[in-house]
Amino acid sequence: MEQVSSSSVTGELLEQEAPPSTPGLDWSQLPADLLIRILGTLEIPDIFSSGVVCRSWHASYLEARRLGICSNNPGPCLVFSSSDRDPSVATLHSLTTGKDYYVTMPDPPFRTRYIVGSSHGWLITADERSNLLLVNPATQAQIAMPPPETIANVKIRCNGEGMLDGYDLFTMDMSSRDFDDEAEPIDLSWEEGRFYFYMRVVLSADPSSGNCTVMILHLLHNLLSFARVGATHWTWINVNELCWNYHDVLYNDDDRLFYAIRGNGDVHAINTNGPSPILRVVLDAKNSLINCAKYIVLSESGDLLQVWRYYHYVNNNKERRTRELVVYKVDLVEHKLVELKDIEGHALFIGFNSSFFLRVEDFPMLTTNSVYCTDDTVHYIYHSRFGFREVSAFHLENSSFTDLVPIGSRLNWPPPAWFRPSYSKESKVLCCVTS
């Protein structure tokens, strides 16, 4: 791997035509201090556009970034690949403006990547060799995480001629915390591995901060492993026999802990700050396994919430859609779940992204008390890579759905995901990229 510095956004990075100029006006002569103040009020995708109009505007754009006055409450975007664009270009559809923005990503081409997460303005992707790459579309910074073969239950496989041939995925015995010698490993190609290694990926912080821990939820049996940016291997969380069957993870900045939800609704708090991970049971749900996807979310007031997502198949079993969503508050005093129909004027975004709330009063184009969803079911995506992809809003008050974002040129691979653009906190970042 080689060390490179992140590049600034230039005309080559944003492929959007500038609007025609007004006769008699030279907008390049707009005073820099006024332009910088204007840039501070714009959504980040619009700042992309402004920064490539001309040299003087680009200089003001760089100064606005340096001063840190760009929006710290960016609106939501749907990121996807468009059939009428180059494979390296990512489309950002802003729900705030209704516009599409086009950003050329660093190699490997965006259309070959599998989006497995988004957080802190970074997309979390896996390439065709199943390597995990963190990339910031705004700064073009890219960071490579430890290779898949350093995950506890993954080994590189050789064929009969001794040539590297893919991955072997082993079952782990939770009682012995070791390989299950009686179970045959699953043979995976280089590309197939990413569907098994990254069911969920969560960041503790902006990766450019130098203090970011990355948590992955992986098969078999929905295990958790973590690594810090710059580390060489993944550490398996195997504190006890309960460390499996996880569905989702979040990071809480306030107490610097990860919170993970299991298939039966149990919630575990996980401390990765010391030499060895420490686990504490926050909620013992005492439920049997319920057949739905479960998300764990932190509200603005600091409450832990669970979202249970039920699916069904439609159109002759060709399309998998959400049938219902139920939101619960975790009552840590009574140790029970309390159903919510009102999320207090917010909209909630779930999918491969780290779940987040937005105040509808700040983004009036959103619908209050609604859950905005994208597809994130790995086995369905694996078996139907170019099939239907759900992008919808579920309205809690009347249990109805609204389909979002007309398909147009939108492709279903990589799977569309929610994303909030952001600039790295550091203006210059040293990051690892694959050579």
Regions of interest found by a model, annotated:
Residues 1-30, 37, 162, 434-435:
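CRL adaptor-proximal regions
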Residues 3-5, 318-435:
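C-terminal closing repeat unit and adjoining cap/tail of repeat-based domains
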Residues 26-27, 32, 76-78, 121-122, ...:
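Tryptophan-centric aromatic hotspots in well-structured domains and transmembrane helices
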Residues 32, 46-66, 93:
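Short helix-loop-helix/strand-helix junction enriched in hydrophobic and basic residues
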Residues 62-88, 107-121:
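Beta-strand-rich domains and repeat architectures in extracellular enzymes and scaffolds
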Residues 85-91, 130-133, 222-225, 265-270, ...:
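Structural motif
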Residues 89-105, 134-151, 225-237, 268-282, ...:
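Surface-exposed loop/turn elements that mediate protein-protein interactions on large endomembrane-trafficking
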Residues 108-315:
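A sequence/structural signal of beta-propeller blade repeats
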